[in-house]
């Protein structure tokens, strides 16, 4: 929701919502995928949980990524296909595809749209949120959700730019919400044009262009 982990107000809000001490939330930004190689080499990372990505195929240094993943003590993959990355995993958690679950996606124009499942899950695959909730509960932080709408409502309650992106707006055919959308009024579908009037969110209000 575009809120910095270093923002005291944001940290306090999330800690209260999640029922955890504020000091339990990290004060620094997390690692990036491109940091993984040297972090494993330096012994700072021993386990990696890969979700819905195929970095062996998508990262520029495929051989380097393969070497990094092979040197982990524990490598977990959560995906819908047997990819070049999942072939290296110690544990594979089979997830549902988009046609087997419902939820919300974000388009490149900032539009949130709801989609329904077309068919029930096959075999042993489970919804992503069910896997995460079950794993979290087993690790000591109970997550008791019944459906994706409950999770979505938690998300928008914590993110000011998304607060008006309700299922009520998105569920009807053709329904959508385009963030920032700060009103729950069913007729308010958000902001079609960002930075109207030429005002940007930089310190001087002007666009910063880089060549």
Show where each model-derived region lies.
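Long, low-complexity segments enriched in small/aliphatic residues
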Residues: 1, 13-21, 152-211
């Amino acid at each position: 929701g575009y809120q910095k982990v270093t923002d005291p107000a944001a940290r306090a809000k999330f800690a209260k919502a999640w029922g955890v001490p504020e000091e339990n939330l990290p004060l620094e930004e997390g690692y990036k995928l491109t940091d993984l190689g040297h972090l494993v080499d330096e012994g700072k990372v021993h386990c990696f949980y890969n979700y819905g990505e195929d970095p062996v195929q998508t990262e520029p240094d495929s051989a380097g990524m393969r070497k990094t993943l092979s040197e982990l003590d524990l490598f977990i993959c959560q995906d819908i296909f047997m990819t070049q990355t999942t072939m290296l995993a110690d544990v594979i958690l089979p997830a549902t595809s988009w046609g087997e679950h419902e939820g919300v996606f974000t388009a490149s124009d900032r539009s949130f749209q709801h989609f329904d499942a077309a068919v029930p899950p096959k075999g042993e695959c489970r919804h992503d949120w069910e896997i995460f909730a079950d794993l979290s509960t087993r690790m000591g932080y109970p997550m008791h959700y019944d459906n994706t709408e409950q999770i979505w409502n938690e998300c928008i309650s914590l993110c000011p730019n998304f607060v008006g992106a309700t299922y009520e707006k998105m569920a009807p055919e053709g329904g959508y919400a385009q963030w920032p959308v700060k009103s729950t009024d069913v007729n308010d579908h958000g902001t079609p044009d960002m930075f109207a009037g030429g005002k940007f969110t930089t310190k001087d209000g002007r666009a910063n262009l880089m060549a």
